Amino acid sequence: MKILQQDDFGYWLLTQGSNLYLVNNELPFGIAKDIDLEGLQAMQIGEWKNYPLWLVAEQESDEREYVSLSNLLSLPEDEFHILSRGVEINHFLKTHKFCGKCGHKTQQTQDELAVQCIHCGYQTYPVICPSIIVAVRRGHEILLANHKRHYSPNGGIYTTLAGFVEVGETFEQAVQREVFEETGISIKNLRYFGSQPWAFPNSQMVGFLADYESGEITLQESEIHDAQWFSYDQPLPELPPTGTIARKLIHVTLELCKAEHKCD
């Protein structure tokens, strides 16, 4: 981090937790003085549109109006990823002010994104928690679940199955375990789909497509309120927001369901 001078220039990432300050739904741009940033701490984390991109240290008291990152999923993908990166780096710096090995204070390294203990020299890098997310298809049907965190009296969001990768697991093993734990369904024909950074606060969602193999839906009641098979040609429940990897998985799977039905 450096102390900003009045003529420091570029795009500015200001965060409060997973919230960001935007101007007309865009990152503020200009010199530090004009955006009332002079004297604050910041670090350059890259470039955006060929200009420096600065992450400003989070302020305890700030009268600016912030917007949740989760409300910005409709932004272009590259812009959403820039915002996510800022949120994740901010979270890392806030939660690693002290050494996890000896408890002394840390300081940022000069040549890479990391913090180092000023006492024992132990170096820590941003923590990324890998999670899997999978869409399961059975013929012309897709398996969707209403997680307890998404439940509402009107039904709530139905989405794909997901969960964190456990220590010692492959991504493929995690997918098979999560699907079976949450719904009692066994799957086959597992294939990679894509990934999405998920800064809530520091996950990396790794997406898969899979086909039904066997089993009847048996809910993991501590996690899942409801799970059902939905046909592509029937009304669907409320789905995750556009821009999420969950919504992309659902869209692709519904297209596969439609193609399967045409071949019958």
Curated annotation (Swiss-Prot):
InterPro entries: NAD-cap_RNA_hydrolase_NudC (IPR050241), NudC-like_C (IPR049734), NUDIX_hydrolase-like_dom_sf (IPR015797), NUDIX_hydrolase_CS (IPR020084), NUDIX_hydrolase_dom (IPR000086), RNA_Hydrolase_NudC (IPR022925), Znr_NADH_PPase (IPR015376). A divalent metal cation 3 binds at residues 178, 182, 223. A motif (Nudix box) lies at residues 163-184. It catalyses: a 5'-end NAD(+)-phospho-ribonucleoside in mRNA + H2O = a 5'-end phospho-adenosine-phospho-ribonucleoside in mRNA + beta-nicotinamide D-ribonucleotide + 2 H(+); NAD(+) + H2O = beta-nicotinamide D-ribonucleotide + AMP + 2 H(+); NADH + H2O = reduced beta-nicotinamide D-ribonucleotide + AMP + 2 H(+). CDD domains: NUDIX_NADH_pyrophosphatase_Nudt13. Divalent metal cations. Mg(2+) or Mn(2+). Binds 1 zinc ion per subunit. Zn(2+) binds at residues 99, 102, 117, 120. A divalent metal cation 1 binds at residues 162, 182, 223. Its cofactor is Mg(2+); Mn(2+); Zn(2+). GO terms for molecular function: magnesium ion binding; manganese ion binding; NAD+ diphosphatase activity; NADH pyrophosphatase activity; RNA NAD-cap (NMN-forming) hydrolase activity; zinc ion binding. A divalent metal cation 2 binds at residue 178. Substrate binds at residues 112, 125, 196-203, 246. NCBIfam families: PRK00241.1 (NF001299). HAMAP family: Nudix_NudC. mRNA decapping enzyme that specifically removes the nicotinamide adenine dinucleotide (NAD) cap from a subset of mRNAs by hydrolyzing the diphosphate linkage to produce nicotinamide mononucleotide (NMN) and 5' monophosphate mRNA. The NAD-cap is present at the 5'-end of some mRNAs and stabilizes RNA against 5'-processing. Has preference for mRNAs with a 5'-end purine. Catalyzes the hydrolysis of a broad range of dinucleotide pyrophosphates. This is NAD-capped RNA hydrolase NudC. The gene is nudC.
